[in-house]
Structure formats: structure tokens, C-alpha cells
Amino acid sequence: MSFPILTVIALLPFVGGVITMMLRGAAARATGMVFSLVTLVLGVYAFIVGVNGTNLSETHRWIRAVGAWYALGGDGLSLTMILLVVILVPVVLLAEWHVGDDETARWSTGAFFGLALMLEGLAIYCFAATDVLLFYLMFEATLIPMYFLIAGWGGPRRGRAAMKFLLYSLAGGLVMLFAVIGVGVHGGSFLLSDLAKVDFSGTIGKELFVGFFIAFAIKAPMVPVHT
């Protein structure tokens, strides 16, 4: 497919998020919901054509110095996860329709809806990325909207919870960064299609596995590294 459907699906919530954060009240709710529903329609379309064999891959040179690519793609698993994301976000927005009416909230309805849309875009990038470095950057970028969502609409100790979440996640991200660098150095590429041909058996494979496992265990979070 020549049309960059995955890029559009990922960027549309960002555009919607920026616009929604400038609005308040009913206008913010309506705008956020419209963008989430349009993203839902495009996500369902991408899922249908993707699982029926259409090639949705997008590959462009990105950071030449390190051999990184702006590469997106979709197989049965990643498209299913993207479909789940685009379905869940409108449900979340409906469930929190009156979030701005809560006197305990720190920011407006537009801020909540905008952050939720931005988080949706980053999640879609994570599931569509076929370049390890691109995945890492999008995965870590989710910390930004997550931090503000927790700090703005969390429980009574939300400030402390948000900071604790951020610090734990950054620690896990640092471990993952070393693993990502190791993959790039050993594999000579960050593209999954190239890395699939590389032999990661032996000590290097075990070390990289441990690095990614620790990072994802913290992100999950899994016992005993949960907060």
C-alpha cells in the first residue's frame, strides 16, 4: 500500500491531542471524541486490509549515523494490538466524559482528553514500529503523558505516585537503552527484518535478553519490581 496508513493512524491522535488541549468543556470533549473515532475507523480499516495480506510497511531513512530507520509495519499480532488501542481510547474518553467536572482534578477536561490522545498515538507507534530504536523512543515517550495523567487525575497522593512511576520507569528505560545499543552493535542494524537474520545465540543473546526482561519487568510492573 502506497498510502502511509500506519503513520496517519499514529499521528492523527497527536494532532487531535494538541487541538483538544487548547479547548475546554464540551468543545474539548467533542473534539477529542471525534479524533478518537476517526482513528478507530482508520484502525479498523488497517486491521482488515492488513490481515487480508496487504503490505502496510513504511521504511524511510532516519538517523543515518547509527543506521536507524523510520520503519512501520503490521502483522497479525501488532495489528490486533493497534485495533485494541483504537477501540479502548473512545471507551476511556466516554468513561471519563465528566472528568473536568471533578473538583479534585488539577487540570481541565481538554488536558485529560489531549493527553489520552497523545498516549494513544505513542502506543500505536510502539506496536507498529519495526525498528528497535524507533520502538524504544516511542515506548519511553509514553512516560510524558502518563506522568501528567497520574499527576493530574490520580488519587490523593498522585504527585508522589507520578514521580515514583517516572523514576522507576526511567530506571527501566536506562536498562533497555543499553540492551537496544547492544542489539544495534551486534546486529549491525535496528531493523527487525535485518535482526531476524542475525545469530544471537550464546552469551550475547542471554545478556540482551536479561536487559530487555529487566526493563519490561519494571514497566509491566512485575513482582518484585512493582511499585
Specify the residue positions occupied by each region the protein language model found.
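Structural signature of hydrophobic alpha-helical transmembrane segments
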Residues: 1-12, 76-85, 132-145, 202-218
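N-terminal signal-anchor/start-transfer transmembrane helix
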Residues: 8-25, 221
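Small-residue packing motifs within transmembrane alpha-helices
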Residues: 9-13, 28, 32-35, 39-42, ...
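Alpha-helical multi-pass transmembrane bundles of energy-transducing inner-membrane proteins
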Residues: 111-118, 122-205
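Alpha-helical transmembrane segments of multipass membrane proteins
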Residues: 16, 20, 39-42, 92, ...
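Transmembrane helix-loop-helix hairpins at membrane boundaries of multipass inner-membrane proteins
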Residues: 1-5, 19-114, 189-197
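Juxtamembrane/interfacial segments at transmembrane-helix boundaries in multi-pass membrane proteins
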Residues: 51-69, 174-227
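Helix-loop junctions at the membrane interface of multi-pass solute transporters
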Residues: 18-22, 94-108, 147-156, 182, ...
